[in-house]
Regions:
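Conserved catalytic loop of SAM-dependent methyltransferase domains
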Residues: 232-258
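Rossmann-like AdoMet
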Residues: 1-91, 95-138, 151-152
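Short amphipathic alpha-helix with an adjacent loop that forms part of the alpha/beta core around
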Residues: 143-152
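Short alpha-helix
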Residues: 213-240
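Conserved beta-strand signature within the Rossmann-like core of class I S-adenosyl-L-methionine
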Residues: 181-194
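A conserved beta-strand element that flanks and buttresses the S-adenosyl-L-methionine
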Residues: 157-158
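A short, conserved alpha-helix within the catalytic core of class I
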Residues: 165-178
Length: 280
């Protein structure tokens, strides 16, 4: 039996990123594989005709490459942390239907997937929690979720496409709270400069009726802008299109590599990594 998804619902907003990850898997098989996305889309009853039509456009295909690189970069950082903290908590902030935690599973870590209650309800149906895994309904801005994470063996948190929808002050409060609660932990997420955030915001600000885009979280120089938030933070960043992979694969055109450089350098599309130092 297929799970029906209606148009203009919260569930629909989760299906489209899933479709992007399936498209990445088809277009760039040497760079990215998301078998979960392919499998889940087979279980869903939804009219993909518009998405399929758009998938042939140049920018849609480049957007799929962006999604692939972002997921790969975040997975790289999670796996790097697990090498030195094999029993750590792996925490997917704003998980949607993303299965990166399970993809990084080393057989010993604990996996937590956090999102709003209606999202977690759908996730439980399509991606029920497995061994050493919990799907936790919460509001990321409310620190009540901190207590649900067993960080005894360390903790690595990652957020994909999440903080563009947070005010700068909200990200700052979250990071400071996490530094208190999870000393020795690491947070990795994607970010971009003000120009890029304005472009992202164009699509959703109209519906949200928000005037002040400038209040939303954007970063150009992560180390100099975020380090002053708290003396315990160890901040670094890498370009998210070319910072982890040179994209010299036959599936990626020279024009797309050029766009990738524009993204990393002009839009400051980056993966930010924040280490939480020990309590002072």
């Amino acid at each position: 039996m297929k799970y029906k998804i209606e148009k203009n619902t919260v569930q629909e907003t989760l299906i489209l990123p899933l479709y992007s990850r399936k498209l990445c898997t088809e277009l760039y098989p040497n760079l990215y594989r998301d078998e979960t996305a392919v499998r889940l889309l087979d279980q869903i009853d939804y009219d993909f005709s518009e998405a399929e039509k758009n998938s042939r456009s140049l920018m849609q295909r480049f957007g799929a490459l962006e999604v692939a690189m972002r997921q790969n970069d975040l997975a790289f950082e999670v796996q790097a942390y697990l090498k030195t903290h094999p029993c750590a908590a792996v925490v997917n902030l704003g998980c949607g239907l993303d299965n990166t935690g399970r993809a990084c599973d080393n057989g010993r870590c604990k996996i937590y997937n956090l999102d709003f209650p209606d999202v977690i309800t759908l996730r439980q149906q399509l991606l029920p929690a497995g061994e050493r895994e919990q799907n936790i309904p919460c509001d990321l801005k409310d620190p009540a979720w901190f207590d649900k994470i067993d960080a005894f063996g360390g903790a690595v948190f990652f957020a994909s496409g999440v903080f563009y929808y947070f005010l700068t002050q909200q990200v700052r409060e979250l990071v400071q709270g996490m530094a208190d609660a999870f000393p020795g932990g690491v947070l990795v997420f994607d970010a971009a400069n003000r120009t890029a955030v304005k472009m992202i915001a164009k699509t959703w600000l109209r519906t949200a009726k928000i005037k002040d885009v400038g209040a939303y979280f954007a970063v150009s120089d992560a180390k100099s802008e975020l380090s002053p938030w708290d003396s315990r933070l160890q901040v670094s960043s890498r370009g998210y299109m070319l910072g982890y992979n040179d994209l010299k694969d036959p599936s990626v055109s020279g024009f797309f590599r050029f766009l990738a450089r524009v993204g990393d350098n002009g839009m400051k599309m980056q993966i930010v990594k924040i280490g939480f130092g020990d309590r002072q």
